[in-house]
Amino acid sequence: MFKKVESKVNFPKIEERILKFWNDNKIFEKSIQQREGCEEFTFYDGPPFATGLPHFGHFVPNTIKDIIPRYKTMKGKQVKRYFGWDTHGLPVEYEVEKSLKISGRYEIEKYGIDKFNEECRKIVLRYTKEWQKTISRLGRWIDFENNYKTMDTTFMESVWWVFQTLYNKGLIYESYYVLPYSPKLATPLSNFEVNLGEYKEIHDPSLTIKFKIKDKNEYLLAWTTTPWTLPTNLGIAVGKDIDYSKIFDKEKDETFIIGTKRLNHYYKDEKAYTVIEQFKGEYIKGIEYEPIFNYFLNQRDKGAFKIHTAEYVTTDDGTGIVHIAPFGEEDYNILKNNTKTDMITPIDAECRFTNEVKDFEGLFVKDADNKIIEKLKSMNLLFKRENFLHRYPFCYRTNSPLIYRPISSWFVNIEAIKEKLIKSNEQINWMPSHLKKGRFGKWLENARDWAISRNRFWGNPIPVWICSKTGNKICIGSKEELERLSGQKVNDLHKDKVDKITWPSEYGGVYVRTSEVLDCWFESGSMPYASKHYPFKDKDNFHNIFPADFIAEGLDQTRGWFYTLTILGTALFENTAFKNVIVNGLVLSSDGRKMSKSLRNYTDPMEVINTFGADALRLYLVMSPVIRADDLKYSDDGVKDVLKNIIIPIWNAYSFFITYAIIDKFEPNNNINLHKTNILDKWIVSEIESLKKILNEEIDKYNLTKSIEELLAFIDKLNNWYIRRSRRRFWKSENDNDKIDAHETLYYVIKNLMLMLAPFIPFLTEEIYQNLKTKDEKESIHLNKYPQAIEKLINIDLEEKMNFIRKVVSIARALRASHNIKIRKPISTIYVVTKDQKEQQILNEMKEIILEEINAKEIKIKSNEEELVTYKAKANFRELGSKLGVNMKVGSLEIMKLTNEDILKIINGNKHIIKINENTYNITLKDIILERHERENLKIINEDSVTIGLDALITEELYLEGLSRELIRKVQNLRKENNFNVSDRIILYIDNSDILKKITNQFESYIKTETLTLKIEINKEKALTNVELDDAIFIKIGIKRWSN
């Protein structure tokens, strides 16, 4: 029935064999086909870029995205899952620019947009085979063949429909606005994309500039940290209610206006200036000043070069006076609301000054800072220069500084649907739950209109055609609509193709498409519709698969994909796009830094899998903080520990069962005997049925952390309690009912455990299942149903009893270890103290287990600790402080004088009065801190309500028994080293040392039983292995397989 389990196991090799079994037998396909007609469980897979290889950051969500669909499939749902590729956008363009050795918008246009886009198309799926190989090797089941790509015409057409639907609802508009802008990419970014990048600490020049008040010999001292914006200065801002001082600078012989609170920053000596006048900012509002540069003098008639009041001005730094240019959102709004100035932006697409600013023409704006400063010096307008350290946003694609600039862009009106977004969020089950009201909820509350246009090339074009004569706009929502209006056949919706499509306007002009493409986040947010070509295909079935039952990605997607899914789902259908989401954290290198190929600070993921196995890696990841959206400092040693402490123990339990099942010719059946008499069998069966119940509840709630904790706790119970305590039942030669029950129980438990573990570690569970399954069972473990609890087999009372006993044993073993008393050395007495009568009853019922586990001869169960300890006491200052007040110091000395008898009375609830300065105080147990002092030869430990004591006095008889146990261990090791089978009987050879004679004479029967020895023989010639029984006690032994 069962195949023998090899003693040496190579888990990666097993996994490769299982992978071949799945592929050859199309097990994944069968898992979906067998659920045809069942309720569908909808899962959306966020599309990655295929321009880079998968890394640990991908492994976490891909593991989660495999666990849940496998589980739901085993729960009877049909879970279709398709891989997707994000094929448009800046990452692809950036890669092509590098390969073509070109950079920037102008060079791309010179190269040719059509040729550039063709290069993008060529590289966009560069690593798809590597992705498929890696993700499959991780054990994830997903359909790669029927994948979707955002560059597919069907996908792009659905995105046009999404855009048109929002446009027709009035939720999309075009406007001029200050936006974060990537000079290297020559395109604006959305605010949430800024948050996907990194804020770095950088030093910028901090300048204080002199602005001359018109027609007066007085200067405003204005502050800026962006010198490059000074050529476009159009105004100055002060705080309406801020106090300002007009001063005369004695050294410079000039008059300045400055925020009063900032005087001491600029003048260390108050005698260096004279205060002429003080006033509020409101007083100088509207005053005109002379521009420091003459590039835009024509703006004076439109309201430029005046003082404005603004709430954002402070005196925390600078001068309390700031210069205004249309390169900041607040500045832009002041100019827009208070002047009629043109929104001058004399910089090109790559943020180089144009010929409007002749002195700095062709310079990148940040590179112009020093030249501008030199110019100011030469004009005697630079009052002070310092350096300013501050956090500044960098582009998440190019890692270069962003520039804020006014630019025309298309927006989704988030403000109009904000309340609906918040309502949609209420419908989502977040795991971890704090994200709902925390990171994601707060992001929604503060969400701003979404800039969705990009001045780029390889993307989904914004489907708006504008009349060249009137500016009338037509928004297109399908290929058919575009063909009807233009009279041209449309096969490809990319920019280089549709930009050539024009048609005459009824107003006399020509309809030409607006030049921008869509933010690729708009496309990924459209994935639920576009991947299904909605509404052009299967429209009636769509609402059966929307919203998704489940999605999973990293924490950064709270401001990325989760956000755009929520926006578009709410805007289109007033519904969330997903019901449940598991969010993972970031995987860092072991030193806490970001994983980096250049730093080589992490192991290649495939090397990890080929060394330890995918199951070990999967389990390591889902056991870690990363599953709770916290960061994980990855280490190979962590995966190695999972292999050693979890995977191998599971294998050992399975190997133990198979070994004895083969020996005893055990024939399994899938029914469990409901009338078992052995308490261990009853307990472990109850435990696994309880585990089934818990796992079904917790995984249904998407709580993988709790699920894993429960599984690991059970594996420990199985190996370190049930199997260890049941070994002799398998060892005995006769096949009595107890042995049969042990086989049946272990078979049932291991098989059910594999079924429960299958979604988490699919390879190992498949390997074990293939050897355990009967002929009439499913071809693969993953085609089975997930185990459901048999309620009548659950015995909570028995579980609580056994857990209490395990706790007592654990505490006692820890006590032995802390005093270096090896478990093989027997002790005379163990004391267990508890006041709980139920616990005392359990101890009496199961004292034989405790004695065996602790290796003690006698157990004494007590209600108090009097026989074990003597007490001393210290004052509990926190409690006594309010009671004793000024008498606290004397009171603490009185408490230190309490006798053992005094303390016992307090423990037992009796009054104990102390008298201090004519005042009396009743001292209770909470007023003192107990100190336990062990009585002679006793070792004591206290945990919660239980105190354990061990009698550490070792008699000669106990000492010899301990040595006999040590001898047994040495013989067992020798059996393993010689590759003896567990059922092999042996002859044991020993030398003629006195100590060995004593041990074998007194414990011969015990030694024979434990080591399957049929004969012990004194034979120096054959006892050749030197072993240490105890400190400095060396003996020689040998073994030989028994043959009749």
UniProtKB/Swiss-Prot annotation:
Its cofactor is Zn(2+). Keywords: Aminoacyl-tRNA synthetase, ATP-binding, Cytoplasm, Ligase, Metal-binding, Nucleotide-binding, Protein biosynthesis, Zinc. It is found in: Cytoplasm. The keyword Cell membrane does not apply. One of its GO terms (biological process) is isoleucyl-tRNA aminoacylation. GO terms for molecular function: aminoacyl-tRNA deacylase activity; ATP binding; isoleucine-tRNA ligase activity; tRNA binding; zinc ion binding. A motif ('HIGH' region) lies at residues 48-58. A motif ('KMSKS' region) lies at residues 594-598. Its EC number is 6.1.1.5. ATP binds at residue 597. GO terms for cellular component: cytoplasm. Its main location: cytoplasm. The keyword Metal-binding applies. NCBIfam families: ileS. IleRS has two distinct active sites: one for aminoacylation and one for editing. The misactivated valine is translocated from the active site to the editing site, which sterically excludes the correctly activated isoleucine. The single editing site contains two valyl binding pockets, one specific for each substrate (Val-AMP or Val-tRNA(Ile)). Belongs to the class-I aminoacyl-tRNA synthetase family. IleS type 2 subfamily. HAMAP family: Ile_tRNA_synth_type2. PANTHER family: ISOLEUCINE--TRNA LIGASE, CYTOPLASMIC (PTHR42780:SF1), SOLEUCYL-TRNA SYNTHETASE (PTHR42780). This is Isoleucine--tRNA ligase. It comes from Borrelia turicatae (strain 91E135).
